Amino acid sequence: MNYINKVMLVGRCGQEPDLKFFESGAVKASISIAVRPPYRSEQALWFDLVAWGNQAEVIGNYVRKGTQIAITGEFGFDRWADKNSGTMRQKPVITINTIELLGSPRKEESTSTSAPNETQAVANANF
């Protein structure tokens, strides 16, 4: 039996990309996106995304908070040991396979200098 693990999302980036460069030359970008349901009264759904290599470089160069993107990727989990207790932790994450830039940040989002808001806190919450 074959299995399919494919995710397709269109949403707006919720934060500036977090880029990491490794000694091996690998590049990793981490972002979150908000996907708004068709009915405005419903709250947006937040997804944590990671990208490697060329996709990470595209994200670092062109994606900013508020940029609308479309991605395809694979669902998985980041796993790590808690530094204090040694307990294994995990959070859901989507690894990007393809990314398409759909639009620039909205004016009010790109010029905002306010403190982090509730949506940023939700985007960074551990599940």
From Swiss-Prot:
Keywords linked to the UniProt accession: DNA-binding, Plasmid
InterPro entries registered for this protein in UniProt: NA-bd_OB-fold, Primosome_PriB/ssb, ssDNA-bd
Pfam families in the cross-refs: SSB (PF00436)
Chain spans, region Disordered: 104-127
GO CC annotations on file: nucleoid
Polar residues bias: start-end ranges: 111-127
Superkingdom field: Bacteria
PROSITE patterns per record: SSB (PS50935)
Every SSB domain range: 4-103
GO function terms (MF aspect): single-stranded DNA binding
Gene Ontology BP annotations: DNA replication
Assembly notes: Homotetramer.
Name of the protein this chain belongs to: Single-stranded DNA-binding protein 2
Lineage: Bacteria, Bacillati, Cyanobacteriota, Cyanophyceae, Nostocales
